[in-house]
């Protein structure tokens, strides 16, 4: 499908082509409950993501990709890694079918560095669309108050985005949320 889209938009003045949510979706599992593991879908990219990115670049466009780095969907293996997820009253903070990474945890930073920054570098992405589709609520454990725990987690998220920019100079970050 991306190949057809690239043909349609060729020479129309676009600068970026962003692969949106679901690029990691496995067969029979909706994209919105499977974020967190970020393994490229063999179903959606049977020739691999490398080939798709090559086609995007060959069309004269800068390739981009979607991440929702701070959340984990219930179908992801990461959903059960509760030692690395935010908690409220000692239980994993869960909203509908999502949980949230503890962005202050060094293991989480290392994991996301591998999954997010590693993916961006490996495939040569020059644009990252960052989404956030769930409310985290009033706060989380880990500080003298739920609000302070939340503030610290958001500060760690911001630090991770700065790390992305340091590791990949010139990358464009689009931050959006619903």
Show the residue positions of the predicted features.
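Aromatic-lined carbohydrate-binding/catalytic grooves of carbohydrate-active enzymes
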Residues: 1-117, 127, 137-138
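Aromatic-lined carbohydrate-recognition surfaces of secreted/lumenal glycan-active proteins
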Residues: 18, 61-74, 155-178
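Short, ordered loop/turn segments at secondary-structure junctions
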Residues: 22, 133, 178
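Short glycine-enriched, charge-decorated loop/helix-capping segments at active-site entrances
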Residues: 38, 144-147
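Flexible, glycine- and charge-enriched loops at secondary-structure boundaries
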Residues: 42, 105, 147-154
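Phosphate/ATP-binding catalytic cores across multiple sugar-kinase/actin-like superfamilies
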Residues: 119-123
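Proline-aspartate-enriched helix->loop->beta-strand connector
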Residues: 124-125, 169
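Conserved N-terminal glycine/acidic-rich loop preference
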Residues: 125-139, 149-164
């Amino acid at each position: 499908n991306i190949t057809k889209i690239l043909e349609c938009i060729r020479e129309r003045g676009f600068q970026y082509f962003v692969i949106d949510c679901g690029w990691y979706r496995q067969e029979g599992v909706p994209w919105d409950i499977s974020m967190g593991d970020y393994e490229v879908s063999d179903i959606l990219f049977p020739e691999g993501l490398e080939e798709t990115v090559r086609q995007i670049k060959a069309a004269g466009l800068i390739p981009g990709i979607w991440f929702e780095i701070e959340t984990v969907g219930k179908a992801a293996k990461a959903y059960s890694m509760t030692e690395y997820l935010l908690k409220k009253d000692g239980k994993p903070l869960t909203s509908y079918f999502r949980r949230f990474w503890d962005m202050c945890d060094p293991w989480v930073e290392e994991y996301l560095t591998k999954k997010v920054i590693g993916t961006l570098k490996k495939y040569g992405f020059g644009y990252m669309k960052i989404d956030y589709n769930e409310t985290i609520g009033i706060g989380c454990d880990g500080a003298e108050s739920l609000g302070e725990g939340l503030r610290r987690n958001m500060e760690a998220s911001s630090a991770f985005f700065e790390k992305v920019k340091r590791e990949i100079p010139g990358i464009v970050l689009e931050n959006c949320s619903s």
